[in-house]
């Protein structure tokens, strides 16, 4: 089935998934970073203290994600999705009325959990378990919400912060979720009868049994490093992009404009990979996941000039585009669709833990005298090791 025919046939559920990936932006680092200067002033925080607060909030959300994520396998999708959307609404309201650092901390926990965690999880788990033959297409289309959010929301938020208080801006975000996001979701999903994939005479395995099955499968350990490498290094490198601009000879304007290449490559890779997954399977394509990122790191290490920023960012964006489509398809192929929610929430939690640790490690290396080139070399080496390990899905060596 072509993309156009698939979209026409499944437009309601695809729009549902894209809405979740788009609105997950309000819990993503790229958007929250726009408010950091205002948080520092309003709550009298230092960069170090806010970084610690943010990492603790991220880790707290990661601890809750496996438990809350598994419920998508157990209750109707329309009910689960409303819980997640309501959680995101509560998080934005809490942020808009945060007058103490403790309130800020809890607002960050809920934003990271309901936004980055559960919103992304809901979209990807739904696509992975509802579709079989067209799973790759479904996941690649649903992932379009990420780059769309990255492309348009920062400018809108930055414009708002020029004229409005940051708390007012969060109040407007809460209104957007309440009067746009939730009604759209309900109109799309109110008649949905998607059920847990389970035979009538089969009991749902306990979460502990599911986890045991996951970690007994050797393929789990062949794939985890390659899954974690892109978000780990991208989180740290993007957080210190100002340092990257100086060390690599790139201006701040060049780095900002290079994000266009990043978003475009991410969209293209995600859409291109969907039909390939449907044709060849995610397991066969997975060993290629880190190749674009490794090429981008090699360009940044061995070449100089403004053009390297665009090529580096584009190639990294390509890996993230592939990753957003490949991961959920891979889980469905390896572990089946019956416990896809449990599997995906577990790995999402592990990923969030890794992204919480990345800023600490990156800051420690930069303070210890490492240059961005040194860090790129380490990132390339770890990416190469992870890529070779993932090849064991098909080759024995």
Can you annotate each of these PLM segments?
Residues 22, 102-118, 308-322:
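Hydrophobic core of transmembrane alpha-helices in multi-pass small-molecule transporters
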Residues 64-76, 269-281, 366-367:
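Helix-to-loop junctions at the C-terminal end of transmembrane segments
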Residues 63-101:
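Conserved MFS/SLC helix-loop-helix module at the cytosolic interface between two early adjacent transmembrane helices
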Residues 109-144, 336:
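Cytoplasmic helix-loop-helix junction between adjacent transmembrane helices
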Residues 13-37, 43-47, 65-68, 237-242, ...:
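Extracytoplasmic
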Residues 277-330:
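C-terminal transmembrane helical hairpin of 12-TM major facilitator-type secondary transporters
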Residues 142, 146-192:
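Helix-loop-helix hairpin linking two adjacent transmembrane segments in secondary transporters
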Residues 32-36, 218-260, 264-270:
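Extracytoplasmic gate region of multi-pass secondary transporters
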């Amino acid at each position: 089935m072509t993309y156009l025919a698939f979209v026409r046939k499944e437009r309601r559920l695809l729009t549902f998934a894209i809405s979740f990936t788009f609105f997950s932006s309000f819990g993503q680092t790229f958007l929250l970073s726009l408010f950091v200067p205002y948080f520092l002033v309003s709550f009298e925080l230092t960069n170090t203290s806010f970084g610690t607060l943010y990492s603790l909030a991220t880790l707290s959300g990661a601890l809750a994600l496996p438990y809350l994520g598994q419920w998508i396998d157990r209750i109707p999708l329309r009910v689960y999705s409303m819980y997640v959307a309501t959680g995101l609404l509560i998080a934005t309201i809490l942020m808009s009325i945060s007058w103490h650092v403790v309130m800020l901390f809890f607002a960050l926990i809920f934003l990271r959990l309901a936004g980055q965690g559960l919103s992304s999880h809901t979209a990807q788990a739904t696509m992975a378990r509802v579709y079989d033959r067209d799973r790759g297409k479904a996941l690649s289309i649903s992932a379009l919400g990420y780059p769309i959010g990255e492309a348009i929301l920062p400018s809108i938020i930055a414009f708002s912060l020029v004229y409005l208080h940051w708390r007012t801006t969060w109040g407007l975000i809460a209104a957007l979720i309440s009067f746009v996001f939730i009604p759209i979701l309900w109109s799309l999903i109110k008649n949905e009868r998607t059920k847990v994939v389970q035979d009538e005479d089969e009991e749902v395995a306990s979460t502990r049994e599911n986890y045991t099955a996951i970690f007994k499968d050797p393929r789990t350990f062949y794939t985890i490093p390659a899954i974690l490498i892109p978000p780990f290094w991208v989180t740290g490198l993007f957080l210190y992009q100002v340092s990257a601009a100086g060390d690599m000879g790139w201006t701040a304007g060049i780095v900002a404009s290079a994000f266009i290449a990043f978003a475009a490559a991410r969209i293209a890779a995600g859409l291109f990979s969907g039909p390939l997954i449907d044709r060849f399977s995610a397991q066969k394509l997975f060993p290629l996941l880190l190749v674009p990122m490794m090429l981008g790191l090699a360009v940044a290490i061995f070449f100089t000039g403004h053009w390297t920023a665009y090529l580096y960012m584009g190639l990294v964006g390509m890996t993230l585009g592939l990753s957003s489509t490949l991961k959920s398809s891979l889980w469905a192929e390896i572990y089946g669709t019956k416990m896809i929610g449990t599997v995906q929430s577990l790995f999402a939690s592990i990923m969030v833990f890794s992204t919480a640790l990345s800023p600490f490690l990156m800051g420690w290396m930069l303070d210890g005298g490492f240059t961005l080139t040194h860090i790129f070399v380490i990132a390339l080496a770890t990416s190469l090791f992870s890529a070779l390990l993932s090849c064991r899905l098909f080759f024995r060596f």
